[in-house]
């Protein structure tokens, strides 16, 4: 078992799944007058024109298994049977890119163009939206399957039969708790 632990700990972080996402962040900016007059709320769009922007974003999300806390307690051997309990996959947004040539703006003549600060703010909102959409992907399940496909051959090389090896994880995730990764 110590040899197994040492072999697995050599991996440190094992990146097992990657997901590419494309998102178009849009914003519609109208000038309006809000207020209250004689206890009546009003909201009037002013005819000075509107501004619209569409920002295409590409993002890369990666899932990995962090073996820094992996120990002998994670491996249970019962005769020829081997049960390996792996740490839960972790998910991170590793990169985002914006094709600036594809950014589209519509600005009425009576309005000013979007400032760099406004565009940066919309890009940040896009990144947050991508992170919020991670639970809809199946990247955690892909990471688990890939980790098993990578580790089982290592155990087979050490003399175990593939049919006697069970790889499991600590926790089952659903869309309500996947954001905790």
Locate each region found by the language model.
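Domain-level marker for long, solvent-exposed, non-transmembrane regions
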Residues: 1-181
